[in-house]
Amino acid sequence: MTSWRLRSKKLTGTVCPMEPPRVAGTVCPMAVFLIRHAKAGSRSAWTESDSTRPLSTDGEAQARAIADGWSHGAPVAVFSSPRLRCVQTVQPLADRFGLAVAIEPMVEEDTPFEHALRVIEDAPDGTVFASHGDVIPEVVDALIRRGMTITGSAGGLRKGAMFVLHREDGRFARCDYVAPPQ
């Protein structure tokens, strides 16, 4: 089995076989979920602070699809970057399970990945994080350097994609890449 290497939002390597699908409604053991925010409006066309740039219509549909298609059991907590597009990405999921979206500045865009990595490693199993295309690849790269492997499609870190991080012996050992809803 070849490990993946994540660079510049692109996965490279050999596809590893996926484990069998999980049964809906069961808690995914030993897993933390990293979701890249869904499709947002154009950065160049947005005239206000980038922190308030919302999801596009397609992004709103992606966020609903993430929540509607969730088959990993009830999350224990949902955290988001302070950026509106991240909050909007996981709000439908939080609503589905009766949770509030908690703001976590350590997973915000342009934050040193070491801060995000620390928060993610300390998170209890079943925690969901919404973050950005600059943070998630750095976190995953750091975990790969520590021996974590990735299974799943080599579709890259597209908006709305998710990494499911599985722990073994207290460390993240395996990661499933889940392509974004279309």
How should these model regions be labeled?
Residues T2-S8, C16, R22:
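Low-acidity, Ser/Thr- and Arg-rich intrinsically disordered low-complexity segments
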Residues K10-L11, P20, A61:
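Intrinsic disorder/low-complexity segments enriched in polar/small residues
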Residues T14-C16, T26-V27:
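Long, intrinsically disordered low-complexity tandem-repeat segments
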Residues M30-E114, P137, M148-S153, L157-G160, ...:
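Active-site-proximal alpha-helix that buttresses catalytic centers in soluble enzyme cores
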Residues C175-Q182:
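Short, solvent-exposed aromatic-acidic interface loops
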